[in-house]
């Protein structure tokens, strides 16, 4: 809003620069063209940031904001209100705190508390001004957007004054207002602390989880893990306990919401897994691994290693039980689940799985899948074998007989992708007899149509689906 010619010799480093800027902003704020006054509003935080931090700055800024609030142009009024968050933040290091007039302006109240009068119908002018502000979507959105900055400046001790306004906004009629609050919920929780967040923000989060606007729910879920980890542990576990039911019911047709939930599994594991007596986090993982959307299954697959590693550090027996549960995927009737098991085995081989656990738990499953007639499963199997070979645990001479039969089956496979991978192994396989190959499983009738859900309750049962799909690409 303020432009100065080079030959004016105007430098911000000069001692009189703040004074000259203050004089300039006063001139343009009095301009008869409303667009000039509007542009000047956006310069207010920058101009007053370099003014001496004294009582004069407080009084001048309040005076200017009061005048702009009463400007004849609604566009100028709105521009001034857009700056309210930045203007309030100017006092973040001021021992005297934020001027009460600016706080009242932010809350939609008359700037001067003494101006609140009884209107004669059971309300005050404060109440009516507040109601008028919240009925305006532009002003409500500005308040919602600036809430974190205001709380950061004023401090958590002033939350009781701001809480009623915040709670009203969480139920605002306009979606974009609720969406803005959902986006900053975790930041406000960080500013307030765990106790106040549990008391005041958890109810708001619950409303957003069931919001009529999916965008609001999606925005909340982007940082839901950060929000939960800021809560007391028992409250976080209560919140987690509700998620599987939402996945299977409210979010069953919204894959992007399920994807957001799945992405938070790794960040929740270190804090919640070992104290999650109900197994909700593992249930959430199983829901992701069984999802009909490939991207969500992939997220679940890559979350397995951190869960296995956490269990293993705590108790080897629990880790084996978790791995055995995942091995059940290898015997599932759906080829999608069988392929998922092979993807799990591959990522575990890349990171955490030891040779003894592999031979004891995973290798029998690979032998079972060697006879699988579905191309997707066969391709996933050869890539898993490639990962095993890259660990250099075995040579052609010392392979366990079960793994030898898997290798023989893959060498006998006529699928070009499988043949190319087997030929690319280093060192090359030698002396493996094709006669050791596992015979193919009995072919079952194909079942065509869209991918059906495999789960209908949080106990994670296998549905009795007889299928042996044939496909030439990755399943959806």
Residue positions per predicted region:
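Extended, low-complexity, acidic/polar intrinsically disordered regions
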Residues: 1-476
């Amino acid at each position: 809003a303020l432009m100065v010619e080079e030959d004016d010799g105007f430098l911000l480093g000069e001692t009189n620069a703040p004074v000259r800027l203050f004089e300039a902003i006063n001139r343009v704020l009095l301009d008869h063209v409303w667009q000039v006054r509007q542009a000047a509003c956006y310069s207010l935080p920058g101009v007053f940031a370099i003014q001496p931090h004294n009582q004069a700055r407080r009084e001048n800024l309040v005076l200017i904001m009061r005048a702009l609030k009463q400007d004849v142009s609604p566009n100028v009024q709105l521009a001034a209100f857009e700056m309210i968050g930045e203007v309030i933040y100017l006092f973040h290091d001021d021992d005297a705190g934020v001027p009460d007039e600016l706080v009242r302006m932010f809350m939609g109240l008359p700037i001067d508390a003494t101006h609140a009068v009884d209107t004669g119908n059971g309300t005050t002018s404060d109440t009516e001004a507040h109601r008028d502000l919240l009925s305006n979507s532009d002003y409500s959105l500005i308040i919602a957007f600036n809430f974190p900055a205001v709380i950061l400046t004023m401090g958590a001790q002033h939350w009781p004054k701001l809480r009623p306004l915040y709670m009203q906004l969480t139920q605002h009629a306009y979606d974009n207002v609720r969406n803005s609050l959902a986006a900053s919920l975790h930041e406000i929780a960080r500013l307030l602390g765990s106790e106040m967040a549990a008391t005041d923000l958890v109810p708001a989060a619950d409303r957003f989880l069931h919001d009529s606007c999916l965008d609001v729910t999606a925005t909340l879920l982007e940082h839901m893990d950060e929000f939960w980890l800021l809560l007391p542990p028992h409250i976080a576990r209560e919140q987690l306990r509700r998620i599987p039911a939402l996945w299977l019911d409210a979010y069953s047709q919204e894959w992007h919401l399920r994807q957001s939930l799945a992405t938070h599994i790794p960040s929740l594991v270190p804090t919640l897994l070992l104290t999650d007596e109900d197994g909700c986090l593992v249930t959430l993982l199983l829901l992701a691994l069984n999802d009909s959307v490939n991207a969500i299954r992939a997220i679940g697959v890559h979350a397995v290693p951190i869960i296995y590693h956490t269990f293993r550090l705590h108790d080897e027996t629990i880790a084996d039980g978790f791995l055995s549960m995942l091995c059940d995927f290898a015997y599932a009737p759906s080829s999608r689940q069988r392929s998922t098991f092979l993807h799990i085995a591959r990522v575990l081989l890349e990171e955490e799985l030891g040779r003894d656990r592999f031979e004891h738990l995973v290798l029998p499953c690979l032998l079972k899948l060697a006879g699988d007639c579905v191309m997707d499963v066969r391709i996933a199997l050869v890539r898993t074998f490639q990962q095993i070979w890259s660990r250099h645990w075995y040579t052609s001479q010392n392979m366990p007989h079960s793994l030898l039969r898997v290798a023989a089956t893959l060498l006998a496979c006529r699928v070009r992708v499988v043949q190319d991978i087997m030929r690319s192994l280093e060192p090359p396989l030698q002396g493996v007899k094709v006669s050791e190959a596992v015979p193919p499983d009995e072919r079952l009738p194909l079942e065509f149509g869209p991918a059906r859900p495999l789960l209908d309750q949080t106990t994670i049962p296998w549905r009795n689906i007889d299928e042996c799909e044939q496909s030439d690409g990755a399943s959806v």
